């Protein structure tokens, strides 16, 4: 059921070293404040911290009590306070309020601020403005790479997407460069580098500068990873906006996977309690279904349950010695498998109930029509109905963005109509969100000259003038009216299928969207790796309106083993989806590669829309 790795598939590097490094550095920073201390942790850092150093480890290093950084007075009576925070101005104001309250009360304590993953000058300026810069000591916890799975690393920076792609804030690019530098220091240099997007290019150049400054560190080392590919999220918004239909993607869309784990509620656990479950390759049941199209999952779990029951039933014919062996060697594993199986069956049932209620099939049909460019009027009517029924502000916004990007912007009449209906249905407070979406290129209005009618009239005039040679040019400009359509055609993103697409035995990456669409980001990666360059993709790059780069260091490549040259690190700047991860895992199996994923954060369509929204849920 799961994609078995080919026998010749290369081994993955051991990324547990990154956890150990992060843990050791944090312990070192905590011990710089000897004695008992209270630790204030920002909410965003709680889940990543739990994966690195749990409460018992913190207690071993004299952390007395833990507090969440929030907008209310702290009740700590400890003489030493340590703050573990992101470099945000609101956090500096919070720390300043505590320190200044102590000053007013005539109380003297020791304060330490640990910034993660790095400190920014702006934060130090705020501490100075608040008059407490001399009262606190500042440090950095350079924790920027969290291994969520054997092949998935996350920087856990969901704000990267909004900060860079909406605000144009480049401060996190240095963090990305430092993370890449750490990887090349630990796992050897990367002989082949490719990338597309403005942010990717800046991160690459900054990283190369760091490499040149410390050239001695990786010199002479054998590369463990043969290729690195950097890609901006805005190169492919379409994939991120589509509903996910692979199991892991659906679990994320339905329950929200956070930092590699998910909270399953009572409707899944069949009890009155919620349960936090870690989703990774160690969960054997999950690992077999994570990359599968959802339509295959129930059948697999049913068969698994029958097999498990058969193993339990073997006990009946056992003698005492056999029973003893069974209890000591197999029973524990069977019970664990049974528990996991029950959870995933419960999750599937819950997903089915929610999706049936939402009329998921009709939604998928509309998305496929938008991707293929068919029945645009019907799809627009479906979106209008969605808005009128007030189904979900985020869902309606997502569908509007998908319509806009696949059609290279909405015609002015449709843009004004949909926007008016949306604001009337969900409230005028969403007006600023539309401004954000326009700035990010997610929801735009066509200029009058771009409309289909304008191009049609141009063609009509040429036909009347019998200017045969120019008719082809006019039709060509008509075809390129939507860059997505042109790119889709160039890269064959919409597979031509004779009969039913077999989701049980998929033949290409399109299976992650029910056979309707190959993720653009994944197709670009596939094409560049095949060519080992951007050669022959000039037209695609031009249509994407992005800068691309490729660099090969022959001396490093000569040192690399054939196995490491089949290991590819893909860096998503602005987030990647589980659908893209599943698609590239499939490609790896087909081509004999192994992909490793590094993302600023795992994302999905809802997170993308929430990042752009000015109305917080």
Curated annotation (Swiss-Prot):
InterPro entries: Sec-1-like_dom1, Sec-1-like_dom3a, Sec1-like, Sec1-like_dom2, Sec1-like_sf, VPS33_dom3b. Phosphorylated on tyrosine residues. (Microbial infection) Dephosphorylated by M.tuberculosis PtpA, which induces the reduction of host phagolysosome fusion in M.tuberculosis-infected macrophages. It comes from the Eukaryota. Changing residue 30 to P: In ARCS1; effect on interaction with VIPAS39 is reported conflictingly but disrupts colocalization with VIPAS39 at cytoplasmic organelle; impairs localization to VIPAS39-containing endosomal compartment; and induces fragmentation of the VIPAS39-containing endosomal compartment; no effect on interaction with STX7 and association with the HOPS complex. It holds the Pfam family Sec1. Ubiquitous; highly expressed in testis and low expression in the lung. Changing residue 249 to V: Disrupts interaction with VIPAS39; no effect on interaction with STX7; impairs localization to VIPAS39-containing endosomal compartment. The keyword Nuclease does not apply. Keywords: Acetylation, Cytoplasmic vesicle, Deafness, Disease variant, Endosome, Ichthyosis, Intrahepatic cholestasis, Lysosome, Membrane, Palmoplantar keratoderma, Phosphoprotein, Protein transport, Transport. The modification N-acetylalanine is found at residue 2. It is found in: Late endosome membrane; Lysosome membrane; Early endosome; Cytoplasmic vesicle, Clathrin-coated vesicle. GO terms for cellular component: clathrin-coated vesicle; CORVET complex; cytoplasm; cytosol; early endosome membrane; endosome; endosome membrane; Golgi apparatus. The keyword Phosphoprotein applies. Changing residue 243 to F: In ARCS1; no effect on interaction with VIPAS39; impairs localization to VIPAS39-containing endosomal compartment. GO terms for molecular function: protein-containing complex binding. GO terms for biological process: collagen fibril organization; collagen metabolic process; endosome organization; intracellular protein transport; intracellular transport; lysosome localization; megakaryocyte development; melanosome localization. It is a peripheral membrane protein. It is linked to Arthrogryposis, renal dysfunction, and cholestasis 1: An autosomal recessive multisystem disorder with characteristics of congenital joint contractures, renal tubular dysfunction, neonatal cholestasis with bile duct hypoplasia and low gamma glutamyl transpeptidase activity, severe failure to thrive, ichthyosis, and a defect in platelet alpha-granule biogenesis. Most patients do not survive past the first year of life. Keratoderma-ichthyosis-deafness syndrome, autosomal recessive: An autosomal recessive disorder characterized by severe palmoplantar keratoderma, generalized ichthyosis, and sensorineural bilateral hearing loss. Additional variable features include contractures, mild bleeding diathesis, and psychomotor retardation. Belongs to the STXBP/unc-18/SEC1 family. Interacts with RAB11A and VIPAS39. Interacts with RAB25. Associates with adapter protein complex 3 (AP-3), clathrin:AP-3 and clathrin:HGS complexes. (Microbial infection) Interacts with M.tuberculosis PtpA. May play a role in vesicle-mediated protein trafficking to lysosomal compartments and in membrane docking/fusion reactions of late endosomes/lysosomes. Required for proper trafficking and targeting of the collagen-modifying enzyme lysyl hydroxylase 3 (LH3) to intracellular collagen. Mediates phagolysosomal fusion in macrophages. Proposed to be involved in endosomal maturation implicating VIPAS39. In epithelial cells, the VPS33B:VIPAS39 complex may play a role in the apical recycling pathway and in the maintenance of the apical-basolateral polarity. This is Vacuolar protein sorting-associated protein 33B. The gene is VPS33B.
């Amino acid at each position: 059921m799961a994609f078995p790795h080919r026998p010749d598939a290369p081994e993955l590097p051991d990324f547990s070293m990154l956890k150990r490094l992060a843990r050791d550095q944090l312990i070192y920073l905590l011990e710089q404040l000897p004695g008992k201390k209270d630790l204030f942790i920002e909410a965003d850092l709680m889940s990543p911290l739990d994966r690195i150093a749990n409460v018992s480890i913190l207690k071993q290093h004299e952390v007395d009590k833990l507090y969440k950084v929030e907008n209310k007075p702290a009740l700590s009576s400890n003489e030493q306070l340590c703050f573990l925070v992101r470099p945000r101005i609101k956090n500096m104001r919070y720390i300043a309020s505590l320190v200044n309250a102590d000053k007013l009360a005539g109380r003297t304590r020791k304060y330490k601020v640990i910034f993660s993953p790095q400190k920014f000058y702006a934060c130090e300026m705020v501490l100075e403005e608040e008059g407490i810069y001399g009262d606190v000591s500042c440090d950095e916890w350079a924790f920027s790479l969290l291994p969520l799975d054997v092949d998935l690393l996350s920087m856990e920076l969901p704000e990267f997407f909004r900060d860079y792609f909406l605000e144009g804030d480049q401060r996190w690019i240095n963090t990305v460069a430092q993370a890449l530098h750490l990887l090349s220091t630990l796992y050897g240099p990367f002989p082949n580098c490719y990338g597309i997007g403005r942010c990717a290019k800046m991160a690459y150049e900054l990283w190369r500068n760091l490499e040149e400054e410390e050239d001695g560190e990786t010199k002479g080392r054998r590369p463990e990873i043969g290729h690195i590919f950097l890609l901006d999220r805005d190169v492919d918004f379409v994939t991120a906006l589509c509903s996910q239909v692979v199991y892991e993607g659906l679990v994320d869309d339905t329950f929200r996977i956070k930092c590699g784990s998910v909270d399953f509620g009572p409707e899944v656990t069949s009890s009155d309690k919620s349960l936090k479950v870690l989703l990774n390759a160690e969960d054997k049941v999950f690992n077999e279904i994570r990359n599968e199209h959802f339509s295959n999952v129930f059948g697999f779990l049913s068969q698994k349950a029958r097999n498990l029951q058969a193993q339990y039933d073997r006990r009946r014919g056992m003698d005492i010695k056999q029973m003893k062996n069974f209890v000591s060697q197999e029973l524990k594993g069977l019970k664990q498998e049974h528990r996991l199986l029950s959870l995933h069956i419960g999750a599937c049932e819950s997903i089915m109930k929610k999706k049936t209620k939402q009329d998921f099939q009709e939604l998928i049909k509309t998305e496929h029509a938008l991707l293929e460019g068919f029945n645009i009027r019907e799809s627009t009517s479906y979106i209008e109905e969605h808005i009128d029924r007030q189904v979900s502000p985020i869902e309606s916004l997502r569908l509007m963005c998908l319509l806009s990007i696949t059609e290279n912007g909405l015609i002015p009449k449709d843009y004004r109509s949909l926007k008016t209906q949306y604001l009337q249905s969900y409230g005028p407070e969403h007006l600023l969100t539309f401004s954000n979406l326009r700035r990010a290129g997610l929801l735009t209005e066509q200029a009058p000259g771009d409309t289909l009618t304008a191009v049609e009239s141009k063609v009509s005039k040429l036909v009347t003038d019998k200017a045969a040679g120019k008719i082809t040019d006019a039709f060509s400009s008509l075809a390129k009216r939507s860059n997505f359509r042109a790119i889709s055609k160039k890269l064959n993103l919409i597979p031509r299928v004779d009969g039913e697409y077999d989701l049980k035995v998929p033949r290409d990456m399109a299976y992650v969207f029910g056979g309707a669409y190959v993720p653009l980001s994944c197709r670009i990666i596939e094409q560049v790796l095949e060519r080992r360059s951007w050669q022959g993709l000039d037209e695609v790059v031009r249509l994407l309106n992005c800068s691309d780069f490729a660099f090969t260091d022959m001396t490093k490549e000569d040192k690399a083993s054939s196995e490491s040259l089949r290991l590819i690190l893909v860096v998503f700047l602005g987030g990647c989806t589980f659908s893209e991860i599943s698609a590239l895992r499939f490609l790896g199996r087909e081509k004999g590669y192994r992909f490793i994923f590094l993302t600023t954060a795992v994302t999905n369509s809802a997170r993308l829309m929430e990042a752009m929204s000015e109305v917080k849920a």
